[in-house]
């Protein structure tokens, strides 16, 4: 089965779309958090509706795994959004999809909808993305980002409708388009070897992401262990990793939000494993903003190993 077919089958489950402010519904990764425009820090805070994570080399995935998760986003303790994330990992391919919606007070101020997806192959244990799409809509406009990749190289990317040229953005070079992953794939941390998935060393890594607009690096470091508990599903230990952001290109250097996030030393992500794999994903994330902490946390986190396909006889 092709990755695109896997994604299509995966998203035919009963996950109801909801509405979320355009800036809050981009798929998982810090890149979306950094795309702060004229809406200022309120939009930056709402971007807690997306995930953080890292990407590191890994051995072959030893089994198949699946995640069905529901998240709530808050800003300064006030509920602003809800979202869903689904991941399927088989022995030779993977697919992931996310969607979200505004809740509580945010419905009175801003409405929108958004979804994102990524698919690719599992090659030597590494998730190699082949395609990524993110669509966001509000009452005023809609936007779709598409990225095509092969072997960690961006082969094509587009934003529809095409944004006007901005000479203030640092140009993205061909070198910046190599050795990267898309934001959705970048939300899954792969752990090499056969050792403990929940060791401090797992946090000590870095990754390079291109989100269609911006190329940036994320560096992670170990902070502590905590126990977490979802209303449904996972309860157990989580790795809490510090997250440090370095923009590379595709950004406006004098933007206040970019400078703020570059200086941040208190961004954190809580990582937990998907059974049957050596993949960890975010259970919770926290991003300080001048309006208070932007927090995304799982309320449902149902992850399980899935059976291998039966081997065919001779």
What positions do the PLM features span?
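Cleavable N-terminal signal peptides
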Residues: 50-51, 61
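Acidic, serine/threonine-rich low-complexity disordered tracts
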Residues: 63-151, 196-314
């Amino acid at each position: 089965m092709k990755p695109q077919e896997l994604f299509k089958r995966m998203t035919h489950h009963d996950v109801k779309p909801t509405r979320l402010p355009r800036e809050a519904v981009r798929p998982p990764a810090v890149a979306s958090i950094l795309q702060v425009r004229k809406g200022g820090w309120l939009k930056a805070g709402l971007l807690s509706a997306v995930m953080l994570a890292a990407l590191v080399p890994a051995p072959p995935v030893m089994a198949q795994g699946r995640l069905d998760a529901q998240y709530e986003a808050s800003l300064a303790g006030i509920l602003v959004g809800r979202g869903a994330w689904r991941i399927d990992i088989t022995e030779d391919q993977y697919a992931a999809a996310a969607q979200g919606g505004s809740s509580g007070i945010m419905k009175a101020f801003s409405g929108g909808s958004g979804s994102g997806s990524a698919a690719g192959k599992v090659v030597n244990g590494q998730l190699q993305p082949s395609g990524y799409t993110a669509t966001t809509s509000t009452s005023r406009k809609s936007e779709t980002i598409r990225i095509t990749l092969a072997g960690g190289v961006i082969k094509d990317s587009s934003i529809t409708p095409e944004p006007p040229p901005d000479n203030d953005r640092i140009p993205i070079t061909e070198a910046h388009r190599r050795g990267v992953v898309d934001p959705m794939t970048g939300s899954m941390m792969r752990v090499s070897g056969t050792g403990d998935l929940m060791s401090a060393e797992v946090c000590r890594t870095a990754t390079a992401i291109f989100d269609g607009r911006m190329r940036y690096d994320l560096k992670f470091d170990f902070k502590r262990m905590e126990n977490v508990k979802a209303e449904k599903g996972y309860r157990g230990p989580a790795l809490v990793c510090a997250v440090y952001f370095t923009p590379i290109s595709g950004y406006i250097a004098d933007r206040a939000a970019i400078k703020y996030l570059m200086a941040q030393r208190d961004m954190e992500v809580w990582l937990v494993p998907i059974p049957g794999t050596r993949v960890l994903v975010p259970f919770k994330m926290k991003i300080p903003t001048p309006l208070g902490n932007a927090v995304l946390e799982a309320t449902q986190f149902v992850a399980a190993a899935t059976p291998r396909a039966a081997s065919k006889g001779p």
